[in-house]
A protein has these predicted regions:
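Alpha-helical segments in transporter systems
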Residues: 9-12, 20-45, 73, 77, ...
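Juxtamembrane loop-to-helix connectors within ABC transporter transmembrane domains
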Residues: 6-7, 15, 47, 91, ...
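Transmembrane helices of ABC transporter permease
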Residues: 21-31, 150-201, 272-285, 302
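Cytosolic ends of transmembrane helices, especially the final helix of ABC transmembrane type-1 domains
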Residues: 228, 252, 269, 300-327
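Loop segments that connect adjacent transmembrane helices in multi-pass transporters
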Residues: 125-128, 201-249
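Hydrophobic alpha-helical membrane-associated segments
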Residues: 31-35, 39, 75-99, 161, ...
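Transmembrane helix-loop-helix hairpins at lipid-water interfaces of multipass membrane proteins
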Residues: 22-87, 167-172, 283-287
Length: 332
């Protein structure tokens, strides 16, 4: 039996004719985050000018006058903010348009494929389950492409850029900041695997519920003829309760993730502030560099609190991808 491909690879393969758009949107997401990380560095450089004056970082490049240095910083700030805004606009346009296009194409491709299947196949399926895939699952993929893909790319960019800056400025302090990162990332993947099973159960339960509701509404005349309202109400209540319980199981695990991450972040941030402060007091670290480290540590660590939500969206999308593309791959 051939090994099953990962849902993300299957999705990218299905969107291969949009490869240029995916690459361009990814590049805009990365560059937007790159410029977004510049303000803490500019703040540190401004503090460096105030403290060091003619001996500041900018003074070493031929600008000894502090007033001139501030004008240069203001000019750089304006350019960076304009670039950040432009790339944010571009990634928003590209990812959202791609999400809408992919949603449309997947829905049409899936419907056209279903339409060509044999009648015997339809007798083995529920209308509600098929509607759930064509509507709910396709919409879930649209939500991931609209925001989740950008979030994952920007998180990876943040870790790479901020980690590099911190190791350049103060390797000892940087180590304290990055210690929790592997723990958080490994924990996230463990979380991803566990939550994935629960979200698959959620998708199955909503399919069953939709199927029951659809069949009952279509057969409402029969239900009334046999005065079976109470029995059918109980069946709907049971299916809805099963769906709610499946969601509760997923929510219980999902809700515990962010508080655990915050504790790991607390260790890194306080250790950075303390050790970096001692080094600055002892003259081992410039005040401007210390300011950059304190500010940029937050930019590295706080986005990790959203890692659970991002993986949550990702895992829901992968569960939906499996259901949609399994349907598309059904042999005619």
């Amino acid at each position: 039996m051939r090994k099953r491909r990962h849902p993300l690879r299957r999705l990218l393969s299905h969107l291969k004719h949009h490869q240029f758009t995916v690459i361009l949107a990814s590049l805009c997401s990365i560059l937007n985050k790159f410029w977004d990380l510049a303000p803490p560095i500019l703040i540190g450089m401004a503090i460096d000018v105030v403290v060091q004056r003619e001996e500041s970082f900018l003074a070493n490049y031929g600008y000894p006058d502090p007033n001139e240095q501030f004008l240069i910083l203001v000019g750089i700030t304006v350019i960076i903010w304009v670039l950040e805004s432009l790339f944010e606009y571009w990634w928003g346009i590209l990812w959202r348009n791609l999400a809408q296009t992919a949603q449309h194409e997947l829905r049409i491709d899936t419907y056209n494929h279903i339409q060509n299947l044999e009648m015997q196949w339809f007798s083995e399926q529920s209308t509600g389950g098929l509607m759930s895939i064509l509507n709910d699952d396709v919409n879930q993929l649209e939500r991931f492409l609209d925001q989740g893909a950008n979030d994952l790319l920007q998180l990876a960019t943040t870790i790479t850029v901020v980690g590099g800056i911190m190791f350049i400025l103060a390797p000892e302090v940087a180590l304290l900041a990055v210690i929790p990162v592997p723990i958080i990332v490994i924990g996230s993947f463990i979380f991803q695997r566990r939550i994935g099973v629960r979200y698959k159960k959620v998708r199955e339960e909503v399919g069953e519920l939709n199927s029951l509701l659809n069949n009952n509404l279509q057969g409402i005349t029969t239900i009334k003829s046999f005065t079976a309202e109470d029995r059918e109400s109980e069946r709907v209540n049971f299916a809805s309760q099963s769906y709610r319980n499946a969601n509760r199981d997923a929510i219980r695990l999902s809700a515990s993730f962010v508080p655990l991450i915050r504790m790991a972040i607390l260790f890194a941030f306080t250790a950075n502030m303390l050790v970096g402060g001692w080094m600055a007091l002892d003259g081992e670290l410039d005040v401007g560099a210390y300011a950059i480290i304190v500010f940029i540590t937050q930019r590295l660590l706080w986005p990790l609190t959203r890692l659970g939500q991002t993986f949550d969206l990702y895992q829901r999308a992968m569960a939906s991808t499996t259901r949609v593309l399994d349907l598309v791959d059904t042999e005619i």
